[in-house]
Each structure stands twice: as structure tokens, then as C-alpha cells.
Amino acid sequence: MDLPDESQWDETTCGLAVCQHPQCWATIRRIERGHPRILGSSCKTPLDAEDKLPVLTVVDILDSGFAAHHLPECTFTKAHSLLSQSSKFYSKFHGRPPKGLPDKSLINCTNRLPKFPVLNLNETQLPCPEDVRNMVVLWIPEETEIHVSQHGKKKRKNSAVKSKSFLGLSGNQSAGTRVGTPGMIVPPPTPVQLSEQFSSDFLPLWAQSEALPQDLLKELLPGGKQTMLCPEMKIKLAMMKKNLPLEKNRPDSVISSKMFLSIHRLTLERPALRYPERLKKLHNLKTEGYRKQQQRQQQQQQQQKKVKTPIKKQEAKKKAKSDPGIQSTSHKHPVTTVHDRLYGYRTLPGQNSDMKQQQQMEKGTTSKQDSTERPKMNYYDHADFHHSVKSPELYETEPTNKDISAPVDAVPEAQAARQKKISFNFSEIMASTGWNSELKLLRILQDTDDEDEEDQSSGAE
């Protein structure tokens, strides 16, 4: 390293072994670099940048300048230089464009992007009535259109989209949009409550009642009357008509090129809109089903009551028709008989010896029961005969020493048993129930007639 003589240096250092002076440290660093201060220099070297105050350089570069290679038609304004002519950095920017800035051909391009239009609802007349209280304005994006040129370069065309808003605006007020940079976001304007009521002249042609589907009109119009719709009904119908294609074409991304303005009502004052017919039908179906279920339960309870009452009457008739005196004289061997309402007296299995005699008795009793069934039913309907019989009565007869071939001896015994039964039945009826005199007489006569017929049939056998 070629260094000048130390006599020409303008440097001073202390001779301490452990130096704590910052000036000495700076001197040592300059000497190590090979640039010590020299005394009596004829020309002054420019001061280092470290010894000067910092200079702020401002360059106006648009965000879209980064996409200059992909968008040759884009326009950029020339950067306004805030540097003075005397600054040493001016020579760097003078004569050639700074690094990162676009060319002059792009700066001087005559094609300029128009300003992105923003629809302000404060200056827009909304076709809503005076009762508008809560409104929500939604921006619904759609997919951007990307076209590829013949040379293989992708270009974004500036597509102006006419806003098919539900407000019925003119062409000058419609929200025409153009494709901008991907980072451009347009915030939705704030809604305004208007106090003016507008007629149907402000509405577009597709919002009229004639162009709307008839099924929607039937749901929203009370009673199915084809009257003129109010503005809020027309807005609601138009939204229902336009929601389906928007949902199909809605992209996943939030930022898009096409925007549509839609108005959603939160509070609807019309009862026809708040309660459409399909909701009423659901409510009616629920109430009708509940009523039908209650009616079925009541019918089942009534049927159960009707089933219980004939059982009691049947048991009472069984007790009245049973005659142990006749049964005791009609068998040689012990036979068990059961009284049934349909078949009269029938034998239990095991008594095969007397089957023929039992069949003859069954024929006589069934014919007797058919002749006396109707008057007995009427009789028991008028008088409550409360006799709790838990099971059908079984009568077991023991063998007797008398011969069946002698019917003359059996007749006095049957008459005696009949008289005892009549007296017993009469006393029991008087003690248990308080019947009328005519009913008592009818009951006694029926018992005597039944017993006479049974005696005749047994004597014939």
C-alpha cells in the first residue's frame, strides 16, 4: 500500500495502550483504508455522504407501472422531479430514464384510461315508498374477461358493463365499469332514506307487473287479485327473478370486473310479503294434522267404551239363562257344560258318551235364544243390571240314581227348582235394584216362559 509520508498526515492519535477516544478509532480506520488526512492539500475533496444531511428523493410512480410489460396501452403520467439542478443526483436522472420507470413512449401515450365511475346513492332517486326503514346495498362481483391475442400475449380488454341495477336509472347514471388493476377496490356507497314517493314511470319495463311470472304474483298478491303492484313489491319480484342467474355465474373471488347493485329489504310492511301463501299452507297443514290426530284418539276411546259395555250385558244374560235344575237331570255321568252366547250350552272335551244328547239340547236352546234375544236386549237397555261376573259359569252335575227313561219323575223336581229360582231372583232383584212395577212383572214372566220351554224340551227327550 503506497501511503504518503507521516509528516504530511493530519492525523493525531494518543499513545495509550487502551484508548477510549472515538476520534482515535476513526483515525486508525482511515489509515487502515489507505486514505489518511493530508496537510496542505491544494484541492478540496468533496465531503463524504456520511458527513451531509440526508437528501429525500421523491418519485411519483403509479401502482399500475409494475404491469407495464403486460399492459402496453396503459398510460402513465410523467414523474415530476423535485430535485434541484444544483444537486449532484440530478445528473443521474438527466438524459436517461431512471431505473424502474417506464419509457417515454408510454408516458407520452395519448390513450388514457377513463376514471372508474362510482355510483353515489345520495344523488340517486330510489323508487321506494316512504315506509323504507332498513336497506342493505350489496355489490355482487362477476368473473373477469381474459382474452388471449394471436401472438400468445395476454391482454385485458377494457370492457364497459352497463349496470342492470334495480333502480331503473338512465344510461348516464348507470354504473359503467372498466377493468382496472387487480388491487383496485371500490367501496359501496352508503344508502340514503328518501322521503319522496315515485310512480311507476321510473321503473324499467321488465319490472312491470305484466312481464313478471304469474306464480310469483299469486304468492305476493293477497287473494289472487290482479291489481297494480306497489314499488316495493316490484323490487322484490325483480330480485327474485334475477337471483338465479347471478348465483350460477357468481365467482369465488371477491374482486371482479362486473358489479351489480341489488337492494334487499329487511322490513316489509305488507302482510302479503311477510306471510306468503306457501307459509300459510304449511301452517294450515300442521293445524289440520293435529286436529285429525285428536279426533282419532277420541274415536278410539269411544270404541273401547263400547266394547266394555256389551261384555257386562253378556255376562248378565249368561247368569239369567243358566238353569242348574234341568242340567242336573239330563246326565248320567259328571259332565261340565259352558254357556256361550252364540252356541248356547256346549260340552267341554272329554265327554264323548253324551254328545248326541248335548247336540239336541243345543238345537233347542239356540231356537229359544233367537226368539227372545230382541226383547231381552231392549229390556236390559232400560234397566242397568249390575252383576259382576268374572268368568263364564261352569256347572258340574253329579250322577243321580234316577233313570232318564222316566220323564214323569223328573217333571216335579224341575217344577220345584223353578219355583225356588223365581223366588230367589225376585228377592235378589228387589234388594239390589229399584225397578218399576211393570219391569218387575215383565222380568218374572220372561223367566217363567223360558223355564217352561226348557221343561218341555227335556220331557220330550
Curated annotation (Swiss-Prot):
Bias (Polar residues): 349-369
Top-level taxon of origin: Eukaryota
Compositionally biased residues, Low complexity: 295-304
Region Disordered, annotated ranges: 289-374
Biased composition (Basic residues): 305-320
Annotated S-S bridges: none
Protein name per its UniProtKB record: Uncharacterized protein C9orf43
Organism classification: Eukaryota, Metazoa, Chordata, Craniata, Vertebrata
